[in-house]
Amino acid sequence: MKLKKKAKMMIVLSIIANLLSGCGFGETKIEYERLVKALDEGDMKTVMSASDDGYAYLKEETSDSTYEEKEDGEHSRIIYQTTHGVYNVKEDDLYGKTTQKVATDIKNDKNVGSNQNYKKETVYSTNLKNEKSRSIAQNQGIDVSYVKIMFRGLNELSKLKPSEDTKRFSEPSIISYDLTELQFKSIINDKLNLKYDKFNSAILMIEFNTPNDTKENQMRIIQITIAVNYEEKKEDKLIKRNQEISTYYHTREDNNQSAKKEYVNYEKEYIN
């Protein structure tokens, strides 16, 4: 009986502690400040969990979507770009491979739930170099402008308060920022360079491996995603556009093991 009372008391004390800390029951405050500061300052060795000699695996997935209403329904066109490579912190460059695919579809009342108009094709796959935010394909006639590699430093981000910075139970450790148009322009669009006629929304999300630093498990960034909804004018009407960019990072252990070797291999493939 005494043990049951003690257990109940521990639960009550836990609830009180959570309430006093500003988090609800089952919630954990994500201690994002150190890594967001590194992202703000362009400390890419920290952001990317780079190897001791400054190399880091990177994967980037981008999608650029266009939606337009026509007489026979909504026409959509989505450009998918997937890039794998290794970034060299000291030289501020990346060597890797990139693939572009394009999907088109027409949706209307007659084909609800049908994929009869859906088409997806691979446009190209090529070796790539990205240097100081500029991407160059091995075959320089190929357009690789959809490769962004843009999260090299998000100035002023650490001054913003995330709209969400708590982890609940088994949820992933993700913070998010609902950006105003002014914040989007100053923090993101100076690198993304989107041209639009109407801004609708922009959300920046950062996922961590754990909500806080511990002696056994140091926090690191797993993924950064920016999703932007906007509209642009075409023949006196506004067309819906969406752009999403996700960047994924490996662990420092992975990078120490083989990132430099892979960087050299990618570089040789690009040059040859």
Regions found by a protein language model. Give the residues of each.
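Short helix-loop boundary/capping segments
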Residues: A137-M219
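Generic short beta-strand segments
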Residues: K59-K70, T99-A103, S176-S186, Q223-E231
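An acidic-aromatic
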Residues: Q81-G141
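N-terminal leader/targeting segments and the immediate start of mature chains
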Residues: S21-T66, E267-N272
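Flexible, membrane-facing loop/turn or short amphipathic-helix motifs
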Residues: S65-S76, I106-V112, Q183-Y196, Y230-K237
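Gly/Pro-enriched, hydrophobic low-complexity segments
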Residues: K185-Y266
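Extracytoplasmic/periplasmic/luminal assembly and interaction segments
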Residues: T62-K90
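Sec-dependent N-terminal signal peptides of Gram-positive bacterial secreted proteins and lipoproteins
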Residues: M1-E27
